[in-house]
Amino acid sequence: MALAPELSRQTKLKEVAGIPLMDPTVNNWSQIQTFKAKPDDLLICTYPKSGTTWIQEIVNMIEQNGDVEKCQRTIIQHRHPVIEWARPPQPSGVDKANAMPAPRILRTHLPPQLLPPSFWTNNCKYLYVARNAKDCMVSYYHFYRMCQVLPNPGTWNEYFETFINGKVSWGSWFDHVKGWWEIRDRYQILFLFYEDMKRDPKREIQKVMQFMGKNLDEEVVDKIVLETSFEKMKDNPLTNFSTIPKTIMDQSISPFMRKGIVGDWKNHFTVAQNERFDEIYEQKMDGTSLNFCMEL
């Protein structure tokens, strides 16, 4: 059976203020920009493939006080809608958010300058997770390969150029992380690093818990550490996206939850690519106090 046009690999990216986004998102831009945030909204913000599902499950378990049964009420992508998601005729992310009771936990991959203005005027809380650029690039490549609603990434070498030029969906990694980092002290933003979460998950989970205004017993925190481990989540059909149709995510090409490690970039970057990337990285990150761990 032929795929519907919107599900084919011919999906195009269109730009909004210089940021490439998926065509249906751009077509729904007016609804996204007029979204009405609420003061008690918590927005999970990430560049793609930076630990979004992981932090989402952590937040979910904290919200439910570590109650595993309550956390299993539905698949993870239905719990916290992505504000900019649009894939007609399905309900948009805005539609889903509008139907949720307060307090809401929502998600976005948007850079700060494209966020609906009501988030800023309502002084919402933002939970940002950043992942080092090299691992992020590799993970996003494999996601691009399996995600049938994104353009074909081509070869690794071709995709390498696309990524460093910021021509992937949701734009430049460099601009994204710098944009959120630069405003972290002006708004209620908890800025976390994927690598810190791998190194000491309990410590980082406790930061999130405090940010959410929760005070859970240590044994509950230990339970959350266990339940949100990569191994547990990879085997959990409620978190591993295995319920998504193959016409959207073909996990026979690459699993949604692939490795979840720090330093996998070394299995992909050539010596020449690594040297070139380091030069570009130094130029683009010049002047920022952001520091990333590239391997543990």
From Swiss-Prot:
Q: Which reaction does it catalyse?
A: a phenol + 3'-phosphoadenylyl sulfate = an aryl sulfate + adenosine 3',5'-bisphosphate + H(+); cholesterol + 3'-phosphoadenylyl sulfate = cholesterol sulfate + adenosine 3',5'-bisphosphate + H(+)
Q: Which family does it belong to?
A: Belongs to the sulfotransferase 1 family.
Name listed for the protein in its UniProt record: Sulfotransferase 1C2A
GO CC annotations, alphabetized: cytoplasm; lysosome; mitochondrion
What is the role of the protein in this entry? Sulfotransferase that utilizes 3'-phospho-5'-adenylyl sulfate (PAPS) to catalyze the sulfate conjugation of phenolic compounds. Does not transfer sulfate to steroids, dopamine, acetaminophen, or alpha-naphthol. Except in mitochondria, where it can add sulfate to cholesterol producing cholesterol sulfate, which alters mitochondrial membrane organization, and impacts protein complex mobility increasing state-III respiration, thereby modulating mitochondrial respiration.
What's its EC? 2.8.2.1
Binding of 3'-phosphoadenylyl sulfate, residues: 49-54, 131, 139, 194, 228-233, 256-260
What is the species listed in this Swiss-Prot or TrEMBL entry? Answer: Rattus norvegicus
Q: Give the highest taxon in the source lineage.
A: Eukaryota
Recorded GO molecular functions are: aryl sulfotransferase activity; cholesterol sulfotransferase activity; sulfotransferase activity
